[in-house]
């Protein structure tokens, strides 16, 4: 007898999700390696190789350092009164004036860089009894001897160098940066030739601070024909405060002040080409896109940049769990649902239906559940970026040799921060991936339960993501199930009748197996009884003797 399931009286409807032949491996909280249909890379690992000049204003230092431009080295005059968002120092920068040192070089460099301007205001300092505008053949401005344009080298006038005592109040409403210096002659003879006194002294003070410097006379390595040195110092004068300069020799006086500004300007060492392009994030390697939450290009950044992490790759799942389709099955050779495997080739949705009925086979996507999953996943990348991208800049840290312990501590702190962010990134991505897989599985289960509630007793769950429908269900009927308009009452009687017929035939077919097993058991029992009876009869006749030994 033919099963009713093989004629036009039944149909099969399977639910499933799409799959791809080769998925992407991602990490979740519970599994280090799980395959998904699609994932996006979260770590930016390469730069453009060039620094973009938009939207940030980039100032190329060329062959000048920021401090040389600040002091007014003759070959850096082009930078007078310049402004910037990011000052780019080049490795080929050099000084071309009187040799100098800055005891607090890193702090001054950082202070000026963050101000973002070299705007200079000349003030009328009165230096009585001394010669101004000293120069050196180590600092040529054209053919003549020159000096730093923002500093005034004071020497003796005739045979005297009086004690200088000059005050300059700050009557403005902004901070003023004064740059000054102390000259260290190479010999005692040079000291008296320039300043008369055998030992000079320079004191610069405000209401908040005071610095007193005694020159160190002695020969040093020759630089540009000079064995003397100048030490550069700086003082900030707040609004309402007063700058007081007292000296009896060796003073390199200020000519005015730099107007200090507050902002997020910075400085970076880089040899990357500056080009006309747009990029929010800049590293010494060049600009990088900021459409990813993490980067491992460089620790030093400027602008709205991804967080630096140690990982070379972090994959964010933007698709569901991937279970490739068993290729030996064929498209409908043995129709199966999502519990067994995914479906390849379903390009118009993530979830869908496959059916087999009297009109043949077919497939259609379920757009509603697909859209529900996509809506929840779409914002993930933006949310991760929002959690990690900040408008900040990680400047370079510089320390003198005597600050080695501070430098070691700073390096330890920075390395610890990177370790923490690398760990946080790993956990954050794993959590998001776990959530993505859980919600896509949930949408599949919701669609399956929705279909089950529609079919009720008109169909049977086959246990593999498919339903056996016990009534004739043409393509219009299948479509009503997909769009949620299916009325199970219309087909209930037919489904019950077909179900009983099919179950009855299955039951009758099952009796044959039971009868065979029962017949075999009875035959074995009768054979044992006959054999036992024969043995007992033979013993009574004496044909068989049985001895029992203890």
From Swiss-Prot:
Gene3D superfamilies hit by this protein: 3.90.20.10, 3.90.209.20
Source species: Influenza A virus (strain A/Duck/Hong Kong/64/1976 H3)
Primary localization: virion
UniProt-annotated glycosylation sites, renumbered to this chain: 8, 22, 38, 165, 285, 483
Miscellaneous remark of the record: Major glycoprotein, comprises over 80% of the envelope proteins present in virus particle.
The encoding gene: HA
Membrane spanning residue stretches: 515-535
Superkingdom to which the source organism belongs: Viruses
Self-association and partners: Homotrimer of disulfide-linked HA1-HA2.
One annotated GO molecular function: host cell surface receptor binding
GO CC, alphabetical: host cell plasma membrane; membrane; viral envelope; virion membrane
Entry protein name: Hemagglutinin
Places the protein is found: Virion membrane; Host apical cell membrane
């Amino acid at each position: 007898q033919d099963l009713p399931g093989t004629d036009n009286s039944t149909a099969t409807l399977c639910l499933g999700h799409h799959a791809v032949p080769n998925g992407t491996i991602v990490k979740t909280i519970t599994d280090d390696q799980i395959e998904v249909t699609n994932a996006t890379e979260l770590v930016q690992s390469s730069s453009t190789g060039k620094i973009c000049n938009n939207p940030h204003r980039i100032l190329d230092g060329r062959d000048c350092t920021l401090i040389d431009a600040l002091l007014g080295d003759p070959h850096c005059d082009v930078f007078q009164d310049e402004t910037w968002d990011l000052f780019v120092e080049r490795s080929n920068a050099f000084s071309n004036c009187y040799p100098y040192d800055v005891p607090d070089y890193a702090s001054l460099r950082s202070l000026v860089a963050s101000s973002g301007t070299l705007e200079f205001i000349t003030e009328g300092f009165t230096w009585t009894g001394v010669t101004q505008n000293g120069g050196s053949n180590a600092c040529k401005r054209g053919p003549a001897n020159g000096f730093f344009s923002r500093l005034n080298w004071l020497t003796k006038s005739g045979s005297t160098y009086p004690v200088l005592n000059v005050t300059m109040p700050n009557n403005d409403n902004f901070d003023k940066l004064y740059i000054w210096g102390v000259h260290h002659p190479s010999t005692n003879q040079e000291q008296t030739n320039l300043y008369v006194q055998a030992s000079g002294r320079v004191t610069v003070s405000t209401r908040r601070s005071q610095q007193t410097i005694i020159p160190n006379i002695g020969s040093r390595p020759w630089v540009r024909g000079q064995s003397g040195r100048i030490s550069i110092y700086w003082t900030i004068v707040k609004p309402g405060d007063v700058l007081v300069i007292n000296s009896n020799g060796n003073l390199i006086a200020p000519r005015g002040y730099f107007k200090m500004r507050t902002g997020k300007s910075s400085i970076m060492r880089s040899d990357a080409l500056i080009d006309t392009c747009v990029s929010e994030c800049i590293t010494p390697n060049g600009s990088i896109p900021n459409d990813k939450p993490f980067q491992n290009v460089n620790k030093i950044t400027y602008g709205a940049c991804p967080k630096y992490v140690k990982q070379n790759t972090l994959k964010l799942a933007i698709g569901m769990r991937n279970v490739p389709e068993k290729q030996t099955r064929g498209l409908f050779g043995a129709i199966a649902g999502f519990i067994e495997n995914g479906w390849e080739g379903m390009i118009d949705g993530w979830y869908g239906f496959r059916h087999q009925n009297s009109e043949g086979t077919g497939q259609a996507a379920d757009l509603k559940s697909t859209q529900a999953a996509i809506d929840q996943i779409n914002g993930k990348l933006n949310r991760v970026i929002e959690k990690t991208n900040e408008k900040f800049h990680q400047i370079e840290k510089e320390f003198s040799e005597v600050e080695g312990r501070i430098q070691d501590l700073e390096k330890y702190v920075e390395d610890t921060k990177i370790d923490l962010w690398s760990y946080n990134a790993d956990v954050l991505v794993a959590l998001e991936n776990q959530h993505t897989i859980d919600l896509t599985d949930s949408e599949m289960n919701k669609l399956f339960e929705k279909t089950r509630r529609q079919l009720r007793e008109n169909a049977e769950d086959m246990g593999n993501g498919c339903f056996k429908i016990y009534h004739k269900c043409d393509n219009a009927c299948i479509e009503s199930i997909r769009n949620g308009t299916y009325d199970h009452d219309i087909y209930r009687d037919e489904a019950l009748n077909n179900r009983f017929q099919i179950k009855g035939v299955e039951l009758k077919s099952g009796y044959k197996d039971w009868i065979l097993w029962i017949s075999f058991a009875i035959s074995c029992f009768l054979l044992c009884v006959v054999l036992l009876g024969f043995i007992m009869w033979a013993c009574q006749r004496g044909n068989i003797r049985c001895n029992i030994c203890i």
